[in-house]
Curated annotation (Swiss-Prot):
<dbReference type="GO" id="GO:0043527">
    <property type="term" value="C:tRNA methyltransferase complex"/>
</dbReference>
<keyword id="KW-0808">Transferase</keyword>
<protein>
    <recommendedName>
        <fullName>tRNA (guanine-N(7)-)-methyltransferase</fullName>
        <ecNumber>2.1.1.33</ecNumber>
    </recommendedName>
</protein>
<dbReference type="Pfam" id="PF02390">
    <property type="entry name" value="Methyltransf_4"/>
</dbReference>
<dbReference type="InterPro" id="IPR003358">
    <property type="entry name" value="tRNA_(Gua-N-7)_MeTrfase_Trmb"/>
</dbReference>
<comment type="pathway">
    <text>tRNA modification; N(7)-methylguanine-tRNA biosynthesis.</text>
</comment>
<feature type="binding site">
    <location>
        <position position="147"/>
    </location>
    <ligand>
        <name>substrate</name>
    </ligand>
</feature>
<dbReference type="InterPro" id="IPR055361">
    <property type="entry name" value="tRNA_methyltr_TrmB_bact"/>
</dbReference>
<keyword id="KW-0489">Methyltransferase</keyword>
<feature type="binding site">
    <location>
        <position position="179"/>
    </location>
    <ligand>
        <name>substrate</name>
    </ligand>
</feature>
<feature type="binding site">
    <location>
        <position position="120"/>
    </location>
    <ligand>
        <name>S-adenosyl-L-methionine</name>
    </ligand>
</feature>
<feature type="binding site">
    <location>
        <position position="68"/>
    </location>
    <ligand>
        <name>S-adenosyl-L-methionine</name>
    </ligand>
</feature>
<feature type="active site">
    <location>
        <position position="143"/>
    </location>
</feature>
<feature type="binding site">
    <location>
        <position position="143"/>
    </location>
    <ligand>
        <name>S-adenosyl-L-methionine</name>
    </ligand>
</feature>
<comment type="function">
    <text>Catalyzes the formation of N(7)-methylguanine at position 46 (m7G46) in tRNA.</text>
</comment>
<feature type="binding site">
    <location>
        <begin position="216"/>
        <end position="219"/>
    </location>
    <ligand>
        <name>substrate</name>
    </ligand>
</feature>
<dbReference type="InterPro" id="IPR029063">
    <property type="entry name" value="SAM-dependent_MTases_sf"/>
</dbReference>
Length: 238
């Protein structure tokens, strides 16, 4: 399992600092997480390289691809993969404890249609995801960066929408979910302004939680406390 950081440079050779949507908090791996990475990475892990993936080589078939950015500890992603063996799933997460937990859960569940990466998703999209190859892109509960001065760090912005669109198939879905109402409004504003997308909600707003997105313990607790969760789906139409 390798980690590569790719930098851009000015004409003078100075490094251009990128604004990232995440803060890397390594945390300490449990023995179980570390063991899962050592055991499962050769078969389920994908190292970052500057070369486009061949999904047939990765999964051994041409089933539809579902890609999730920031899967946390991976419980929901593993459940989705287990419930949809006719699809292929790729999860991208920057925090190694989450990657280890996901691999451990995948092994226990016996899923074979899941692969994971531990790298910055933007760089993965730029260097490894082929155009018109992703059926569904999932972004569930990204960091809301709720302070106004930090909004520039939000992953959902015009540049991101433009970057991911060619990676989706025609008719492909970008599915977002957040428990911050302000961020949900921001998501819709950004995506409505982005060319080549349409909101699939009949009222042009939000959709009920789809059955395919598992209800997390965190989300269930939020419901009990009266907290809202907003699901948004945009379709590539150009």
């Amino acid at each position: 399992m390798t980690e590569v950081t790719k930098n851009d440079f000015t004409e003078e050779g100075k490094i251009v600092r990128k604004i990232r949507s995440f803060v890397r908090r390594e945390g300490r791996l449990t023995k179980g997480q570390e063991g899962a990475i050592q055991e499962c990475w050769p078969s389920m892990g994908i190292d970052f390289v500057e070369q486009m993936l061949d999904w047939n080589e990765v999964f051994g078939n041409n089933n539809p691809v579902v890609l999730e950015i920031g899967f946390g500890m991976g419980a929901s992603l593993v459940e989705m993969a287990k419930n949809a063996p006719e699809k292929n799933f790729l999860g991208i997460e920057v925090h190694r404890p989450g990657v280890g937990a996901c691999l451990a859960a995948a092994k226990e569940a016996g899923v074979t249609n899941l692969r994971v990466m531990c790298h910055d998703a933007v760089e993965v999209f730029e260097s490894m995801i082929p155009d018109s190859s992703v059926n569904t892109l999932q972004l569930f509960f990204p960091d809301p960066w709720h302070k106004a001065r930090h909004h520039k760090r939000r992953i959902v912005k015009a540049e991101f929408a433009e970057m991911i669109r060619p990676k989706l198939i025609q008719g492909g879905i970008f599915h977002m979910a957040t428990d911050w109402e302000n961020y949900s409004e921001h998501m819709i504003e950004v995506m409505n302004a982005a060319p080549g997308y349409e909101n699939i909600a009949t009222d042009g707003d939000f959709i009920p939680r789809p059955d395919e997105r598992p209800l997390t313990k965190f989300e269930a607790r939020g419901h009990r406390l009266g907290h809202g969760v907003w699901d948004i789906k945009f379709r590539r139409n150009a």
